[in-house]
Amino acid sequence: MIQKIFDEKYNFITMFNPETGSYVRTGILNQHGWDSGIDPFQASFPHLIDVGIMGHCIHGKTGLCLKAGIGCYQSGLTVYEPNMSVEDFQSIAEQCKGRVNQFALGGRGDPDQHAQIDQILMICWENN
């Protein structure tokens, strides 16, 4: 199902197909609802939200990334913080419902290593 968002503040439409990843955006719509050809400079809300659900990195702590020659911009070797709670993620997702096309899950480590990744993915699906 194609997701369609009308930006009332800046008067344009975005459409996203979650199955194919196709994304299109109109220009600013004129008083007749036609594309004016003028590119909207910004949206009233981001269409992609990058949420740092990971507070630490299993691979970084073991030094595996360093041994492979991979530098970590998140200080995975030295920093250990708790991962984001499902409740906090749900709160973010609910605030974004109907306003965002995609959630990018990240943080300090592999998001698929989050203990509640199944719940987080379900929350993404429910709030797309």
Regions found by a protein language model. Give the residues of each.
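A general secondary-structure boundary signal
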Residues: 12-15, 86, 123
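Catalytic domains of carbohydrate-active enzymes, especially glycoside hydrolases
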Residues: 91-101
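Canonical Radical SAM [4Fe-4S] cluster-binding loop centered on the CxxxCxxC motif
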Residues: 40-88
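Short glycine-/acidic-enriched loop or helix-start segments at secondary-structure transitions
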Residues: 62-63, 114-117
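Core AdoMet radical
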Residues: 48-52, 73-84, 99-114, 124-128
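N-terminal [4Fe-4S]-dependent radical SAM core
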Residues: 1-57, 61
